[in-house]
Amino acid sequence: MSKYDDYELVKFSSVRLPYKYDALEPFIDEETMQIHYNKHYLGYLKKFNTAVEKYDINEPVIKIMQNIDKYPIEVRDNGGGYVNHSMFWKMLKPNPKKKNNVPYGISLIKIIEDFGTYGQFKEYIIEASQKRFGSGWVWWVMNRDGSTNILATPYQDNPYMPEYQSFPLLGIDVWEHAYYLKYDADRTRYIKNIFNVINWEEVNRRIVSANQNIFDVRIMN
């Protein structure tokens, strides 16, 4: 039990962190992961569950996101924080030997189709993160016509929400709590380093899901 493990879970449950807190070192530090997961993520979850009970919401979580304009702001902020981070943990994986971590399979095919090269793809993500003023997320998304692009969203917004209407393939948290302890104000260095721990197997799985038109509730498994 870490010093940060102090939240009880209610209705929607947490996605278990699929690696130890220090497993993403040296790219993401242990203390950041502890605080990020146990304070921020579980905090969003607790507040989301409170809001769901308060407003008597009985929809699957992605349906809530897709119809978020129906709900008060605390549902958007905390539900978005819950959904975004639940995906984010699975989109990362340890790389202890610091091997060259590059996309493969369907991820690489889509990157070449839509961005030309993996290097150019990374540059688009870096640029989007630099232009995202304040807190938010940078996403690689698939649209309903099968095309993909880079999207930046404010705060805890995500691609499922009505104004974006796309399917998240990869999401990177650019809130300061995701990187400040290790990188200080250098968001760009954080983004460049996080490519070392992207879980391309999970991204491939999400591309297959998107191609099968799974634009619905089955993202949390």
Provide a role label for each language-model segment.
Residues 2-221:
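Feature for soluble, non-membrane regions of globular proteins
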